[in-house]
Regions:
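Membrane-embedded translocation segments of transport machinery
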Residues: 2-7, 11, 167, 171-328, ...
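Inter-helical loop and helix-membrane interface segments of multi-pass membrane transporters/permeases
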Residues: 3-5, 32-37, 67, 72-90, ...
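Transmembrane helix-boundary motif of multi-pass solute transporters/channels
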Residues: 12-47, 234, 248-251, 255-258, ...
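Hydrophobic alpha-helical segments and their helix-loop junctions in multi-pass secondary transporters
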Residues: 57, 102-124, 178-204, 273-274, ...
Length: 496
């Protein structure tokens, strides 16, 4: 039975998309990755990655979703033919595994929001806040508890639907998040010692700008924070009107993501420098870029300022809200694929959320596990981006640009030289980056770099996890082709 298709308003669509962009990918991930990769050098590389990777990819995804009116699996089937269906499954699977560990991050934020109210202390040292962080993350029961709460909240809102749940929530949450980030950034940069952080953040160091690692991390961050390659823009674009301006919407997403990321950097990095005992200690903390950077240093910052309890609650509460707005899109990617196969939407929401919670318990068990998942599926995002580019090449890059991206009503037109060049070189660029990154693991783990059964950031674990997803996609390809509903451009021969 055909199910009623909900629609976003233009403002609601942009708010929901920004909800994905301005989540923990900016507030939690950007500062630590930026700090670990040289600050200013990383910002330059990341800006270039946004232009040559994220914006063209977001535009392509939006065009595909608007045209096909199906999820990732159906869109790949209809745009590329039935031999491309497994690629659509890979994109959806990458998003699912990202969702599974992403909710663990949301649980971290919920924990600190609760702690800010229930057991807030003043004038803590870095050692004390580091001990609090370690005590929490070393307790799987606590982490899984907050992980469960996070999924329950996200499931409840997505269950309400597109306009009644996701759009309504994001239109309030995103402006509030921007407001608190601006206020915290102003405060952080006025702290004594914050100038070292500003210098670190905006100084371009030669050794970092020439490092391939900086560029690879920049491209991963561009994908991670904008949602390029996740498949969520393909999914959300099912719910926009025919006259939605693709280039303008994607430009707003990119600029909003950039602003959110820079504001987050201005909050976290100057605060670390201001709160560290010595400049050397600050530099060491920044260069490590560990998972707890925000939860150790920003929490300590709040314990030292007037009204810290309230501000801490607001910050971590809004960070949890940012995370949950990102979760909406990840859940919706899986839900749309399941709904396309004839399952009722509300049943699909519950099934996807429950499966995500179960899989996410692996990441909740230890920091080592979540680091492994961040490593594997961060690379998976680049592969997903390459698959979307390959799909565009198969369908016709120029055809997508003229008929779908620069369609009638578009206020901004993406130039042929820019869009076509970026999309055509993207698969090669991804192969080079991922290949280099995987070969680097031979130096990091010379004895175990190909061992898939060790939880570390090595090549073996990537090949195993990618391999399982690809094999499942190939084996179930015919099932997906037959079971997935027909869209607006479906050809009968692709459904068998």
């Amino acid at each position: 039975m055909e199910q009623k298709q909900e629609k976003f308003s233009t403002i609601g669509y942009i708010a929901a998309a920004l909800g994905m962009c301005i989540g923990t990918g900016n507030v939690w991930r950007f500062p630590r990755i930026c700090a670990a990769n040289g600050g200013g050098a990383f910002i330059l590389a990341w800006t270039i990655a946004m232009l040559v990777f994220a914006v063209p990819l977001l535009s392509t995804e939006m065009a595909i979703g608007k045209k096909a009116r199906l999820g990732c699996i159906g869109s790949f089937r209809d745009f590329g033919g039935k031999k491309y269906t497994w690629m659509g499954f890979f994109v959806a699977a990458v998003c699912f595994f990202l969702m599974s560990y992403y909710c663990v991050l949301q649980g971290y934020c919920l924990k600190y929001a609760v702690k800010s109210v229930a057991s807030f202390e003043t004038n803590l040292t870095t050692d004390t806040t580091a001990a609090i962080w370690t005590s929490f993350t070393d307790s799987p029961a606590q982490v899984i508890f907050f992980h469960a709460i996070g999924f329950a909240l996200a499931c409840f809102i997505v269950y309400q639907g597109i306009a009644g749940g996701i759009e309504k929530f994001c239109k309030v949450a995103i402006p509030a998040l921007f407001a608190i980030l601006v206020g915290l950034a102003i405060y952080a940069v006025t702290l004594k010692g914050a100038d070292q952080g500003l210098q670190y953040l905006f100084t371009i160091k030669k050794e970092y700008i020439l490092s391939p690692n900086t560029w690879i991390q920049a491209f991963i961050q561009a994908a991670w924070s904008t949602g390029a390659g996740w498949g969520f823009i393909i999914t959300y674009s099912n719910y926009v009107g025919e006259d939605e301006d693709v280039p303008t919407s994607c430009l707003i997403m990119g600029l909003g993501d950039n602003l959110g990321a820079i504001l987050s950097g201005l909050v976290v990095i100057p605060a670390i420098c201001a709160l560290s005992a010595t400049p050397e200690a600050a530099t060491e903390a920044l260069s490590q870029g560990n998972f707890g950077l925000t939860f150790i240093y920003i929490y300590q910052l709040f314990t030292t300022i007037p009204g810290g309890r309230f501000i801490s609650f607001i910050f971590f509460g809004l960070l949890a809200i940012a995370a949950i707005t990102s979760l909406f899109s990840m859940i919706e990617v899986g839900v749309k694929c399941v709904v396309d196969m004839g399952v009722a939407r509300k049943k699909a929401v519950v099934a996807v959320c429950f499966a995500g919670f179960v899989v996410g318990c692996f990441s909740a068990w230890s920091l080592n596990n979540i680091d492994n998942q961040d490593w594997v599926w961060g690379l998976g995002l680049l592969i997903s981006g390459a698959f979307i580019a390959i799909l565009a090449i198969k369908y016709g890059v120029e055809k997508i640009r003229t008929e779908e991206v620069n369609a009638k009503g578009a206020e901004i037109h993406l130039p042929k030289w820019y869009f076509n060049t970026c999309m055509c070189i993207m698969p090669v660029l991804v192969v080079v980056m991922v290949g280099y990154w995987l070969l680097q693991t031979r130096e990091w783990f010379p004895d175990t770099w190909l061992n898939p059964f060790i939880i570390q950031d090595n090549t073996g674990t990537v090949l195993l996890q990618f391999g399982v997803v690809i094999v499942v996609g190939l084996v179930l390809g015919k099932f997906f082709n037959c079971k997935t509903a027909k869209g607006r451009i479906t050809k009968e021969e692709n459904c068998r």
